[in-house]
């Protein structure tokens, strides 16, 4: 396994998320993980995507994450535009319920059958379609209770905004809150401009053969999309399924 020396505290560097991760183990493919240390003003550990998203009328957002502490609301994915500070937002509250905001519409809040365990990797997928406003959240391959229709129905998510991982933006690229930050680890975050079916999502959530488990995002692809790291975020090898 190759060693990666991540960004130091207070620096910003470009991360190419799979420069050194090309081999595989029998028990699970080696991939990259990003560690977010605790936030405290003025330090807000985060990844900021280089570039923006296109207009979107359907999405699937999937990722693996591990929580170190669950004392308050944890923000995983925040996409803001000049017109809307919650164009797309996903988070986990301390009671264990997942939230998804789309285009500032009333948020989807669901309680999932699989409890989130501190220090354990979990796989999460969010889907949304503008056509009927159908939104779902699933954890570890299982649908959560409370999936709904009528969420931002007929809406198009606008291009031109900023994607931030690990912090919630209250303005584009700013106004972060330490009480809404991720303290933990994140891996294999991918975004598609379509809704994946249940079987595809189940494959992504399992420690299966890489050809079955990995369906790479066509909007954000973890091993190719470029990010900047701030305030002590560290990239290292990771074996999710080991």
Curated annotation (Swiss-Prot):
Residues 30-241 form the Pentraxin (PTX) domain. SUPFAM superfamilies: Concanavalin A-like lectins/glucanases (SSF49899). Pfam families: Pentaxin. Phosphocholine binds at residues 60, 63. PROSITE patterns: PTX_1, PTX_2. Ca(2+) 2 binds at residues 168, 170, 180. Ca(2+) 1 binds at residues 85-86, 168-170. Disulfide bonds join 62-125, 112-144, 207-241. The keyword Transport does not apply. Keywords: Calcium, Disulfide bond, Glycoprotein, Metal-binding, Secreted, Signal. One of its GO terms (molecular function) is metal ion binding. It is found in: Secreted. Residues 1-24 form the signal peptide. SMART domains: PTX (SM00159). Might serve the role of immunoglobulins. Homopentamer. Pentraxin (or pentaxin) have a discoid arrangement of 5 non-covalently bound subunits. This is C-reactive protein 1.4.
């Amino acid at each position: 396994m190759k060693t990666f020396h991540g960004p130091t505290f207070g620096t910003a560097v470009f991360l190419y998320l799979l420069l050194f991760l090309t081999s595989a183990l029998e028990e699970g493919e080696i991939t990259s993980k990003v560690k977010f240390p605790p936030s405290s003003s003025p330090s807000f550990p985060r990844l900021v995507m280089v570039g923006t998203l296109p207009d979107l009328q359907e999405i699937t957002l999937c990722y693996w994450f591990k929580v170190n502490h669950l004392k308050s609301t944890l923000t995983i994915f925040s996409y803001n535009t000049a017109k809307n500070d919650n164009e797309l937002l996903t988070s986990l509250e301390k009671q264990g319920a997942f939230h998804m905001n789309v285009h500032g519409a009333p948020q989807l809040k669901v309680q999932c059958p699989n409890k989130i365990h501190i220090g354990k990797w979990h796989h999460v997928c969010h889907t949304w379609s503008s056509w009927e406003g159908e939104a779902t959240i699933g954890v570890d391959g299982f649908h959560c209770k409370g999936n709904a229709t009528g969420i931002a129905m007929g809406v198009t998510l606008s291009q031109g905004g900023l994607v931030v991982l690990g912090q919630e933006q209250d303005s584009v690229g700013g106004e972060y809150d330490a009480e809404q930050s991720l303290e933990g680890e994140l891996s294999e975050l991918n975004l598609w401009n379509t809704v994946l079916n249940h079987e595809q999502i189940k494959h992504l959530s399992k420690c299966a053969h890489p050809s079955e488990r990995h369906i790479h995002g066509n909007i954000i692809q973890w091993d190719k999309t470029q990010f900047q790291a701030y305030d002590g975020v560290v990239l290292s090898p990771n074996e999710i399924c080991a």
